[in-house]
Curated annotation (Swiss-Prot):
Disulfide bonds: none annotated. The gene is plyB. It is found in: Secreted. The active site is at R218. One of its GO terms (molecular function) is pectate lyase activity. Keywords: Calcium, Carbohydrate metabolism, Cell wall biogenesis/degradation, Lyase, Metal-binding, Polysaccharide degradation, Secreted, Signal. Belongs to the polysaccharide lyase 1 family. It comes from Aspergillus terreus (strain NIH 2624 / FGSC A1156). Binds 1 Ca(2+) ion per subunit. Pectinolytic enzyme consist of four classes of enzymes: pectin lyase, polygalacturonase, pectin methylesterase and rhamnogalacturonase. Among pectinolytic enzymes, pectin lyase is the most important in depolymerization of pectin, since it cleaves internal glycosidic bonds of highly methylated pectins. Favors pectate, the anion, over pectin, the methyl ester. It is an enzyme of class 4 (lyase). It holds the Pfam family Pectate_lyase_4. The lineage of its organism: Eukaryota, Fungi, Dikarya, Ascomycota, Pezizomycotina. This is Probable pectate lyase B.
Length: 325
């Protein structure tokens, strides 16, 4: 089985330089891609803004106006954008970062919408008043790919919110090739033990080919969801790894932990445990203490994702995850 197209494109993009004209053409082609991997291929698929026009934005005002526009749109972020804002992303959007672009202090709120792609974005230091770097709430069919999400460990734990939170029954989400780093709170799935009525039976999420480095906890923390984690690498976690809570069903495959505390796959801080099937995972001396679950590769509704193999994860994933397109 061949590697997914998005994985191969990352390798090609880093292998050789190209002219500005070719780079712009590559950017437009990649910004027009639909999600090919994981749960966001379900429910009709995730195409983002491909049905609409393409615009390039260079400042916060332009980015906000384009992202909140109610028509389908592909938005290409160029250069460095900074400020203090919470952008409410509308349905049928692709927001794609050019190589070298960055967004500082601005959170993206994807609430009660559908068909959104966030790709090749570098987002950092979002103040808690502006929410998560990316927050997905009551939304369907969202693809987060090749993003670089970071915070600031020198700040107080509650000064910044999560890097990527998925809550309130959101469905058909894929998080792929993303670099989570230098932050207190990584990724929270399901915000409360008391939200079973909304969350149970929803929160179908794939985490594929991601790199977690120097993150304190929530890598991810999962309540109620059905979550497939494959080809992920956790390095230098500060407190804990994958927290399986509140009847969550989790499948962890072809992944590795290095330089991490004892609790790699565990349960804590909820009324009752979740469950995990763990297949070809190098715990790096850490432990898995979660009861075995029922989510298996054969029960997944989408095409198989090629497993890199735990022995190759540490030398592969850091070179491909993040803003690498």
């Amino acid at each position: 089985m061949r590697l997914p197209t998005l994985f191969m494109l990352a390798a090609i993009a880093t292998a050789s330089p190209m002219s500005d004209l070719n780079r712009r053409e590559m950017t437009r082609r990649q910004a027009a891609e639909s999600c090919p991997i994981g749960y966001c291929t379900q429910n009709g698929g995730t195409t983002g803004g491909t049905a609409g026009d393409t615009v390039t934005v260079t400042d916060l005002a332009g980015l906000t106006e384009a992202a909140e526009n109610e028509t389908p749109l592909t938005i290409i972020v160029s250069g460095a954008i900074s400020g203090s804002a919470k952008i409410r992303v509308a349905s049928d959007k692709t927001i794609y970062g050019e190589t070298g672009s960055s967004i500082t202090g601005v959170g993206f709120y994807i609430r009660r919408v559908s068909n959104v792609i966030m790709r090749n974005l570098k987002i950092g230091q979002v103040d808690a008043d502006n929410g998560d770097a990316i927050g997905i709430d009551e939304s369907t069919n969202v693809w987060v790919d090749h993003c670089d999400l970071s915070g600031d460990l020198s700040a107080g734990k509650d000064d910044l919110d999560g890097l990527l939170d998925i809550t309130h029954g959101a469905e058909w989400i894929t998080v792929s090739n993303t670099y989570f780093h230098d932050h207190w709170k990584g990724s929270l799935i399901g915000h409360s033990d008391s939200n079973e009525g909304e969350d149970l039976g929803h929160l179908h999420i794939t985490y594929a080919n991601n790199y977690w480095y120097n993150v304190n906890s929530r890598t991810p923390s999962i309540r109620f969801g059905t979550v497939h984690i494959i080809n992920n690498y956790w390095d230098n976690l500060l407190l804990t790894g994958v927290n399986c809570r509140m009847d969550a069903q989790v499948l962890v495959q072809s992944s590795a932990f290095s330089n991490c505390p004892d609790e790699a796959i565990f349960f804590a801080d909820s009324d009752y445990t979740g469950y995990a099937v763990v297949d070809d995972v190098d715990l790096g001396g850490s432990t898995n203490s979660v009861p075995e679950g029922t989510l298996t590769p054969s029960s997944l509704p989408y095409d198989a994702i090629e497993a890199i193999g735990s022995a190759q994860i540490a030398t592969t994933i850091p070179g491909t995850a993040g803003q690498k397109l």
